[in-house]
Amino acid sequence: MHYDPIKNVFASLIKKYPFLRITFYKLLDIFFLRSWYVRRELMKLRKAFGAKTIEIYDAGTGFGQYSYFMSKKLNPTNIFSVDIKEDWIKDAEDFFSQIKTQDIKFNTEDLLQINHENRFDLILCVDVMEHIHDDIKVFSNFYRALKRGGFLLINTPSIYGGSDVHSNEDESFIGEHARVGYSQEDLVNKLHPLGFMTYKCQYTYGFWGDKSWRLGIKYPMILLNFSKLFFIILPIYYLITFPFTLLLMILDYNTKNKIGSGINFIAQK
């Protein structure tokens, strides 16, 4: 299954009206459990910097929802948000200009080719690395871009059921993925030789979270991939299922998962 065609539908719907984009951001924050985990860690990292202005690199900003959150909740900040999709960057740039946000700048960048030097205090990389074959090159670029003591927060599927792969015979549920995901050991083995050290690691989407993802994300996406007409019945579907999905998400969020289909990894330079 491919997410990008569905993402492009949403991108076209929200591009003209700021209130629609803000509403869309809030819905993403509610429906995607990974957003719960990422936002919690961002708030904790903000405290680690005290009152100083932090320079943030949103590496693979997508719709721009995390840049919006960080601009609102992590102040004072200067945020540099990039994505490889030029049209999405243009849409995000127009939106933040309309709502008169001054602390975010945008650019189209390929993470394999960036050459920032000792520029950022924090790099946020959410659901990006599973799309990139040469991940070591990107991690090396991130290390060079960070200031000494800076943090890299990676959120990605794990090898334990990420992309809905549970055995060697399974294919990734997401067609755009270059790999199934990572384990803690994978990330340690790739990041530590570059000079990073592990600050924190947490598996997400454990027993409860995996069930919430299937009910709240996987099954609706399968329907939408089959036909965009299913957009019409989505509100009814979520009206029936979301109370159960929300309960499962809350259970996962408050559980220390020994293993899970997602992973939050924070490295420090």
What are these regions (language model features)?
Residues 2-37, 65, 84-88, 95, ...:
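S-adenosyl-L-methionine-dependent methyltransferase catalytic module, highlighting the catalytic core
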Residues 50, 73, 257-259:
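Short, flexible hinge/linker loops that cap or flank conserved catalytic cores
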Residues 39-46, 54-165, 265-267:
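Conserved SAM-binding loop
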